[in-house]
Amino acid sequence: MARVTVEDCLENVDNRFELVMVASKRARQLATGGEDAKVPLEGDKVTVVALREIAENLINAKNVDQQKRPLHEF
């Protein structure tokens, strides 16, 4: 379980506000089953997984809204 820092994530998003918005949207997608994680879960909570995805530049502000949503959100 690698530690994720805000600085790691800020290399891939514009500012802290955007980081919070992207991470919260992605964590909700993961928690509700809308999309599979793009990194190994390793027993981490969905918020940590979301931050790891952002730090590895797998999720960003442009593509977080393009991820699949569960049917109950329509």
From Swiss-Prot:
It comes from Marinomonas sp. (strain MWYL1). InterPro entries: DNA-dir_RNA_pol_omega, Pol_omega/Rpo6/RPB6, RPB6/omega-like_sf. GO terms for molecular function: DNA binding; DNA-directed RNA polymerase activity. Its EC number is 2.7.7.6. The RNAP catalytic core consists of 2 alpha, 1 beta, 1 beta' and 1 omega subunit. When a sigma factor is associated with the core the holoenzyme is formed, which can initiate transcription. GO terms for biological process: DNA-templated transcription. It catalyses: RNA(n) + a ribonucleoside 5'-triphosphate = RNA(n+1) + diphosphate. Keywords: DNA-directed RNA polymerase, Nucleotidyltransferase, Transcription, Transferase. GO terms for cellular component: DNA-directed RNA polymerase complex. It is an enzyme of class 2 (transferase). Promotes RNA polymerase assembly. Latches the N- and C-terminal regions of the beta' subunit thereby facilitating its interaction with the beta and alpha subunits. This is DNA-directed RNA polymerase subunit omega. Pfam families: RNA_pol_Rpb6 (PF01192). Belongs to the RNA polymerase subunit omega family.
